[in-house]
């Protein structure tokens, strides 16, 4: 009988050490469970982090595009997209791109009515492609287009590489060449062929010029509003020019301009022809953009400093230290943590249980 009593005493005195999953030590950790609500445990691993705002960076493992043309000095992305003189150069390929100009504008050249068309979207459209290049050839012969012959207009506000008068390389300002064809005209149509490599999208830039009545008669022989239409890939767009009412505006140190240009673009899929119907003041397409592949685009800011696992619209460049994050929820690209509303913890200890009270000896 004594042997049995001794055995029971051993088992009782060691109970808190041999039962797995239970501890009697104090525990500061509380986790929420699906079945038992809040539970005290002996240890947890935090699964979430709350990022702090940082600068944007290059995405690890891929090329990241900031400016469309990094080597085009004193040029906005819209200058590059329209091929303003001194703003042409190689656009590096990239799998990820930073949208850093919310409302792109041109830095100089001829005054543009930016908000009459979707032209502000052009830089960001180009940014969404992995590979972008400007064609080496003009898409049409502007001098011999319907309604010609034309001379190609230039502006002193668009100095070229030799500091002579120039214009955007994507368009030709078609001005009637002589008095014989400097008259009002019915609508004319020109076909815009596909000249890119098969499989590429062709982005064709075009537009029109308008001025006050005196200048319209002087340049085109017609002071009435002119009509313009573009059509490509099932999308048709119509415009009517505005005559006069523009204050003189100087661009990039050039002479004050009483006229304005409206610029638009159309996307031609592989092998597809586009059309432009026009009257006087047409800016005929010339060099076109050939683009392929896809680049992930995210809103951000420049310069890009260093590298990061993830690019987040609100926090900039993030390195993934935890699988989840709390804070502001926004678009992110790369190897990013997942947004959660509240912090998550992984219990890696045991369930806490207060120590058993010893029975008093009788």
UniProtKB/Swiss-Prot annotation:
In natural infection, inactive HA is matured into HA1 and HA2 outside the cell by one or more trypsin-like, arginine-specific endoprotease secreted by the bronchial epithelial cells. One identified protease that may be involved in this process is secreted in lungs by club cells. Palmitoylated. Pfam families: Hemagglutinin. The keyword Signal applies. It is a single-pass type I membrane protein. The keyword Mitochondrion does not apply. One of its GO terms (biological process) is virion attachment to host cell. GO terms for molecular function: host cell surface receptor binding. It is found in: Virion membrane; Host apical cell membrane. Residues 1-15 form the signal peptide. Homotrimer of disulfide-linked HA1-HA2. Binds to sialic acid-containing receptors on the cell surface, bringing about the attachment of the virus particle to the cell. Plays a major role in the determination of host range restriction and virulence. Class I viral fusion protein. Responsible for penetration of the virus into the cell cytoplasm by mediating the fusion of the membrane of the endocytosed virus particle with the endosomal membrane. Low pH in endosomes induce an irreversible conformational change in HA2, releasing the fusion hydrophobic peptide. Several trimers are required to form a competent fusion pore. Major glycoprotein, comprises over 80% of the envelope proteins present in virus particle. The extent of infection into host organism is determined by HA. Influenza viruses bud from the apical surface of polarized epithelial cells (e.g. bronchial epithelial cells) into lumen of lungs and are therefore usually pneumotropic. The reason is that HA is cleaved by tryptase clara which is restricted to lungs. However, HAs of H5 and H7 pantropic avian viruses subtypes can be cleaved by furin and subtilisin-type enzymes, allowing the virus to grow in other organs than lungs. This is Hemagglutinin. The gene is HA.
């Amino acid at each position: 009988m004594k042997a049995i009593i001794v055995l029971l005493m051993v088992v009782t005195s060691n109970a808190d050490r041999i039962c797995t999953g239970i501890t009697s030590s104090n525990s500061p950790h509380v986790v929420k469970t699906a079945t038992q609500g809040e539970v005290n445990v002996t240890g947890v691993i935090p699964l979430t982090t709350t990022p702090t705002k940082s600068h944007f960076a290059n995405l690890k493992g891929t090329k990241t595009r900031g400016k469309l043309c990094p080597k085009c000095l004193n040029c906005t992305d819209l200058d590059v997209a329209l091929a303003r003189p001194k703003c042409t150069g190689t656009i590096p390929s990239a799998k990820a791109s930073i949208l850093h100009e919310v409302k792109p504008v041109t830095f100089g050249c001829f005054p543009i009515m930016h908000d009459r068309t979707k032209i502000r979207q052009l830089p960001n459209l180009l940014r969404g492609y992995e590979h972008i290049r400007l064609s080496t050839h003009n898409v049409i012969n502007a001098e011999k287009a319907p309604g010609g012959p034309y001379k190609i207009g230039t502006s002193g506000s668009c100095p070229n590489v030799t500091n002579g008068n120039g214009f955007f390389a994507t368009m030709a300002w078609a001005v009637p060449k002589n008095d014989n064809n400097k008259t009002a005209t019915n609508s004319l149509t020109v076909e815009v062929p596909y000249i890119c490599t098969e499989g590429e999208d062709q982005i064709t830039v075009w537009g029109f010029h308008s001025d006050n009545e005196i200048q319209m008669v002087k340049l085109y022989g017609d002071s009435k509003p002119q009509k313009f239409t573009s059509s490509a890939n099932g999308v048709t767009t119509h415009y009517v020019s505005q005559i006069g009412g523009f204050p003189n505006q100087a661009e990039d140190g050039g002479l004050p301009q009483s006229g304005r240009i409206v610029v638009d673009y159309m996307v031609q899929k592989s092998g597809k022809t586009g059309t432009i119907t026009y009257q006087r003041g047409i800016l005929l397409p010339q060099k076109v953009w050939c683009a392929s592949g896809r680049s992930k685009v995210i809103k951000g800011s420049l310069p890009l400093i260093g590298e990061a696992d993830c690019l987040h619209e609100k926090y900039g460049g993030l390195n993934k230290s935890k699988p989840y994050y709390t804070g502001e929820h926004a678009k992110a690209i790369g190897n990013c943590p997942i947004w959660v509303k509240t912090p998550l913890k992984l219990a890696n200890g045991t369930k806490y249980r207060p120590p058993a009270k010893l029975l008093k000896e009788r």
